[in-house]
């Protein structure tokens, strides 16, 4: 059986990590077996290199589910990357509160707050994709290479482009409903192992109950 609390799941491969085991920020929550591969930087530096503008003052969260696959260079762009579009100027005056005799607690008025980034389970995020603040990605979705995701992605939907748009659904509606109902990623490791042939063959009819 696999061991979910190790850092490197593959012998001799230090470019791939189980992400949960290298995260220290309490505002980043990662599910078991979700992996990140990086052939440019140390994958253990995910917090610093891939989760951007994620400042404690916002209390915004990155939540990623179980069994996700995140490719090299994928980025999660948080609220502090924004500037306010509702004010007359996009210049972040509150950020320079000392210069302009403003109240320090109003720093967050420098940007529009879109909320957390939430990634479901069994999601594949492609090479150098960018996920914006406030986006929710459904279970089983695929994010294409260098896609810029500015809107929510439905479950089991493939998206790509700038900005990312739906390309196709991975399965028919009946199969998607079945997958969302059985939620295989919540099974025990033993039940997953028993059903790997069916999972890899894309055949829900062959699922074995235990």
Model-derived features: where do they sit?
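N-terminal capping/interface segment
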Residues: 1-20
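Structural signal for interior beta-strand "rungs" in well-ordered beta-sheet cores
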Residues: 16-83, 94-99, 106-166
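Glycine-rich phosphate-binding loop and adjoining beta1-alpha1-beta2 segment
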Residues: 84-88
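C-terminal segments of enzyme domains that contribute to small-molecule binding surfaces
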Residues: 93-94, 101-131, 163-210
């Amino acid at each position: 059986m696999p061991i979910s609390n190790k850092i490197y799941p593959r012998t001799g491969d230090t470019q791939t990590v189980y992400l949960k085991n290298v995260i220290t920020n309490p505002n980043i929550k990662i599910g078991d077996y979700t992996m990140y591969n990086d052939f440019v930087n140390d994958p253990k530096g995910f917090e610093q290199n891939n989760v951007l503008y994620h400042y404690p003052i916002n209390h915004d969260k990155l939540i990623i589910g179980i069994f996700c696959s995140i490719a090299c260079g994928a980025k999660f762009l948080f609220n502090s990357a924004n500037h306010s579009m509702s004010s007359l100027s996009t210049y972040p005056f509150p950020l320079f509160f000392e210069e302009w005799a403003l109240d320090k607690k109003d720093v967050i008025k420098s940007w529009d707050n879109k909320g957390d980034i939430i990634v479901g389970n069994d999601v594949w995020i492609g090479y150098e994709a960018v996920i914006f603040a406030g986006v929710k990605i459904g279970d089983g979705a695929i994010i294409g290479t260098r896609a810029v995701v500015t809107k929510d992605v439905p479950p089991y939907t493939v998206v790509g482009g700038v900005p990312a748009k739906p390309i196709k659904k991975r399965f028919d509606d009946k199969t998607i409903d079945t997958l969302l109902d059985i939620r295989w990623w919540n099974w025990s490791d033993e039940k997953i192992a028993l059903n790997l042939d069916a999972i890899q063959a894309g055949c829900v009819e062959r699922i074995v109950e235990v």
